[in-house]
Amino acid sequence: MGRFRGGLRCIKYLLLGFNLLFWLAGSAVIAFGLWFRFGGTMKDLSSEDKSPEYFYVGLYVLVGAGALMMTVGFFGCCGAMRESQCVLGSFFTCLLVIFAAEVTTGVFAFIGKDVAIRHVQSMYEEAYSDYLKDRARGNGTLITFHSAFQCCGKESSEQVQPTCPKELPGHKNCIDKIETVISAKLQLIGIVGIGIAGLTIFGMIFSMVLCCAIRNSRDVI
């Protein structure tokens, strides 16, 4: 009996440790998602009328999952401390929802990468054409693109040189740079989503083991 209670206590502390880690991971995911959405390249693009909302869907899911992770981490600690089967069962269900959300984010980021790249490239092509037709009307949008992606023009930068960043060393094709930047960012989002999903699996295992151990201990008593 003493050995059984010792094992139960060990599982409980493992779950408590997991929930602390899970809460911190949730905070990091929210910070990561908000920084990705409102910082740097994406901050510049979001100010445009035709901002790439398709690109942001995965980030919205990621931030929502991060908020849920923080909440679930807190209730998971409560369930482990109180040894409540009901709370642990709810905790397991929430982890399952988070797992599905993170896998969706990861898959969406990897599969939707080409669509997002083409969408942003078409936005640039349109801004480029507008500038050549009316330099006053298309000036602001093109400057935003060149500043966000640190590039200038397409095959040549001569026609759009006034909109290029002054600190940019040499010519950099914006079509190629957009593909490189968006691909890298979406790949990072996908890796974070899949990584959190993997962490969630351990939480589901710990919660089920503890729930079964609590039930068995009460049966013994």
Curated annotation (Swiss-Prot):
Function description: May play a role in signalling in oligodendrocytes in the early stages of their terminal differentiation into myelin-forming glia and may also function in stabilizing the mature sheath.
Looking up PANTHER family in the UniProt record yields:
TETRASPANIN (PTHR19282), TETRASPANIN-2 (PTHR19282:SF155)
- The set of disulfide-linked cysteines is none
Q: Which family does it belong to?
A: Belongs to the tetraspanin (TM4SF) family.
Q: What is this protein called?
A: Tetraspanin-2
Which species?
Mus musculus (Mouse)
Chain ranges sitting on the Cytoplasmic side read 1-13, 76-90, 210-221
- Any single Pfam family the record assigns to this protein: Tetraspanin
Taxonomy, top ranks, is: Eukaryota, Metazoa, Chordata, Craniata, Vertebrata
